[in-house]
Amino acid sequence: MAFPNIEQYPQISVDCESTGLEWYKEDRAFGVSIYLPTGDAEYYDIRKDRNAFHWMKDNLWKAKKIVNHNIKFDIHMLRATGINLNPANCECTMIRAALIDEHLLKYDLDSLLKKYLKMSKDNDIYADLAQIFGGQPTRKVQILNLHRAPVDLVARYANIDTEGAYKLWEWQEGEIERQDLHQVWQLERRLFRHIVEMERRGIRIDPNEANRRAEELDRVTAETVAELNRLAGFEVNPNPSGSIKKLFNPKQNEAGIWVARDGTPLPKTDSGAPSLGAKSLESMTDPCAKLILKARKLNKTKDTFIRGHVLGHAIQNGQDWFVHPNINQTKSDTGDGSEGTGTGRLSYTRPALQQIPSRDKEIASIVRPIFLPDRGQKWSYGDLDQHEFRIFAHYANPKDIIEAYAQNPDLDMHQIVADLTGMPRSATKAGEANAKQINLGMVFNMGAGELASQMGLPFTIESVDFGDHVHDLKKAGPETLEIVENYYAKVQGVKEMARKARTIAKSRGYVRTLMGRHIRFPRGMFTYKASGLIFQGTAGDLNKLNICNIAEYLESECPYNRLLLNIHDEYSVSLEDDGKEIKHLKELQGLVQHRPELRVPIRIDFSHPAPNWWLATRADLATK
């Protein structure tokens, strides 16, 4: 058989069919479809056609550009099978789709082809597979039989995928041009190969430590529930249950508002009953509410995270155990678009590392010791200092704050605002206005009602009819409104920035981050969030730029070291203990802090290397 000269084409589409999804375990590719710009497609069963396998092994990595939907999966699966693609030359239509519109409900190839190109994949194949193997004619049931199907049937299915991905990529080229998304797309494209490498190499774990930590969580959970029962005077099931309603005994006041026993107003469910969900519990001052939330968090950490995500996905490689997290650059194709973020932040699944709270020292101290650097190396940890608040200051451009940072780049944003407004930096008691909480409200567009709730100040709940549904909204009392107006008066530029962003969002339908990412407001909804989403989106963009700079420095200057992970505003690296680690950490610090395009300085410090993730977060700083 004659194989195509793929080096002559500016781009091709490649898609593999596999025995399953777990490339990091035993699943492998069994077939590959290649689509050319000429419109020709060919499917190769590489189990039977070993000439095709060896040709791909020798030639696919030479392709100028390879495009596909969720091509990261193909890279991993083909590599596990013995065929290497060059991630630097690969482009993912799923990542591009989320840049073009971050609000879609689905990002799978079939949904995008129907939406943009009026094309449809061959879903009849599931009926054909059901006729051969039995069972329901659905993708979920039949996709597991694909590797057993006749070659011509698989070829029909696979070739439609590569053709569809190629044509979607072509359409996206024009749309990226039309929307002027080149800058942010180049950032995502540059980042892609580093994400692939971080996933491929994974993170080393200690399974024995994981089991010990799960047992410790059993003990702490039991103590928490015992204290809850003591305060309640009866046994309370911390999961949603009738005992929680009995505990908080909600009643309607004269205005018809449901209130808990501590006086906290409660929103209503669709049926008009009082809602005692997590948000209601977070609003309460009742200590039992905090114990319920703590017990739930401990159970989730133990059962879902440690036993499910970590131990459930750990694999042994030689004498070590690893997890290989799935890192979502934007939105995923899982069907509901729930993985990844519209503002550009990374998210992790399998395990969901971002769910380990960075500020909850109790949970962090239990979970983070499970994660280890590469064998023979140590773990160093860097955390950006008030990153989103500094970006908030850059955009709002308040004269006093800009001048304060110019005099001392290490100043605390919350203390600066406290000095300007006369409020304490942090709350010293419930119901006390404080600079930190108001800054959080401004960055995350809480609204005055939610801000009042967070600070423990008076608020009411009003039902608002949106036409298709009725929604309960928190309405701040006069005390909170006065505090917010005082904030606007003393921290000048914030109110004007919010007004300007909202106006642009309403008139244009989107706002742009520093790197050109579009944050859209379909039908003009939620434009009051525009300024905060600019801050968060810009932070996400700069975070991705930092990942690229850190990974490329380590790759160039000390390739035996590597970037392990990035969650929240943290960067973790694995380093040789060779006497040069402090030099490398200071270089990384300089790369992250060099942001001349911002009006305010960016600050990060890296820890002295330590044996595990938790100890690195507790170690002295190496870059001060």
Curated annotation (Swiss-Prot):
InterPro entries according to UniProt: 3'-5'_exonuclease_dom, DNA-dir_DNA_pol_A_palm_dom, DNA/RNA_pol_sf, DNA_polymerase_A, RNaseH-like_sf, RNaseH_sf
GO term, biological process aspect, one: double-strand break repair
Molecular functions (GO terms): 3'-5' exonuclease activity; DNA binding; DNA-directed DNA polymerase activity
Recorded catalytic activity of this chain's protein: DNA(n) + a 2'-deoxyribonucleoside 5'-triphosphate = DNA(n+1) + diphosphate; dZTP + DNA(n) = DNA(n)-Z + diphosphate
SUPFAM superfamilies in UniProt: DNA/RNA polymerases, Ribonuclease H-like
Coiled-coil annotated residue ranges, if any: none
Keyword set includes NAD: no
Keywords, in A-Z order: DNA replication, DNA-directed DNA polymerase, Nucleotidyltransferase, Transferase, Viral DNA replication
Family: Belongs to the DNA polymerase type-A family. DpoZ subfamily.
Function: DNA polymerase that preferentially incorporates the non-canonical base aminoadenine/dZTP instead of adenine into the synthesized DNA. 29 times as efficient in using dZTP instead of dATP as a substrate. In addition to this preference for dZTP, the phage also encodes a dATP triphosphohydrolase that removes dATP and its precursor dADP from the nucleotide pool of the host.
Protein name as catalogued: DNA polymerase DpoZ
Organism of this sequence: Acinetobacter phage SH-Ab 15497
Name of the gene this protein is made from: dpoZ
